[in-house]
Amino acid sequence: MILLIDVGNTNIVLGIHDNEKYIASWRISTDSKKTSDEYSIQVMQLFNQAKLNPEEVEGIIISSVVPNIMHSLENMVRKCFCKEPIVVGPGIKTGINIKYDNPKEVGADRIVNAVAAFEKHKKPMIIIDFGTATTFCAITEKGDYLGGNICPGIQISADALFERAAKLPRIELEKPKSVICKNTVTSMQAGIIYGYIGKVEYIVKRMKKEMMDLGEKEPFVLATGGLAKLVYSETDVIDEVDRKLTLEGLKILYEKNKE
């Protein structure tokens, strides 16, 4: 069994891969104040509930965009599994050529997604990850990571509107039927959600043009992350949603880097 750990700004996703399939996955809150002991208790409870034996874990790989949580998580791995985890970062074998000005600046999550997308599709691609931040990444047919862009996630946009506009309430991110709304809540929902979809469509259109100007074929657009399906249902610029893209990338990177 391989334990895959994807640390995001809001949630930590853990997956267990065994015999070419996923046998368990969990989502817990990211909390940099938790100690390694607290994470150890939580992870062991998850294993017990799933009736999994931690001694059968052969290896662990961690991808994180939250640096100050890594000490606790790495110690948790050592305590629970008596192994050193592979950590996605500078020096790791990826199989892709990162064309960033400073490759060390590329977030681990973006590298992991790019590896999975390229291994699976082997074509020019735009990868959109709808997380706390929304990231757009461009990959060539040869596997060059050209770069991309980062913008606030949908929830951040909603929170900012609530926090900075005194008379506007905090709202649930639900899709209204119309963009011509007759109350404050649905007006905010329409502006946030449909406005966000418009932003995605424009960025994808612009990225496609820039990639094709470089001689690439029209890129395939792959989306992942918690709100990917919401956006996918309202636009035709996304070709596919892959909710397990990051875990797939971690599994591929583990195989490339295990001793």
UniProtKB/Swiss-Prot annotation:
SUPFAM superfamilies per UniProt: Actin-like ATPase domain (SSF53067)
Where is the secretion signal located? none
Catalytic reaction equation(s):
(R)-pantothenate + ATP = (R)-4'-phosphopantothenate + ADP + H(+)
What the record says about family reads: Belongs to the type III pantothenate kinase family.
Question: Organism classification, top ranks?
Answer: Bacteria, Bacillati, Bacillota, Clostridia, Eubacteriales
Q: What does this protein do?
A: Catalyzes the phosphorylation of pantothenate (Pan), the first step in CoA biosynthesis.
Q: Which residues bind K(+)?
A: D129
Q: Where does substrate bind?
A: Y100, G107, A108, D109, R110, T184
Q: List keywords of the entry alphabetically.
A: ATP-binding, Coenzyme A biosynthesis, Cytoplasm, Kinase, Metal-binding, Nucleotide-binding, Potassium, Transferase
This protein's GO CC annotations: cytoplasm
Q: What is its EC number?
A: 2.7.1.33
Primary subcellular site in the record, as a coarse category: cytoplasm
Which protein, by its recorded name, is this? Type III pantothenate kinase
Question: Quick one: which gene encodes this?
Answer: coaX
CDD domains of this UniProt entry? Answer: ASKHA_NBD_PanK-III
Q: Which Pfam families match?
A: Pan_kinase
**Cofactors (names):** NH4(+); K(+)
- Identify which residues the record assigns to the active site: D109 (proton acceptor)
The GO biological-process annotations, alphabetized, read as: coenzyme A biosynthetic process
Q: How does this chain assemble?
A: Homodimer.
State the pathway, as annotated in the record.
Answer: Cofactor biosynthesis; coenzyme A biosynthesis; CoA from (R)-pantothenate: step 1/5
Q: Where does the record place it? A: Cytoplasm
Q: Which InterPro entries match?
A: ATPase_NBD, Type_III_PanK
The record's cofactor note says:
A monovalent cation. Ammonium or potassium.
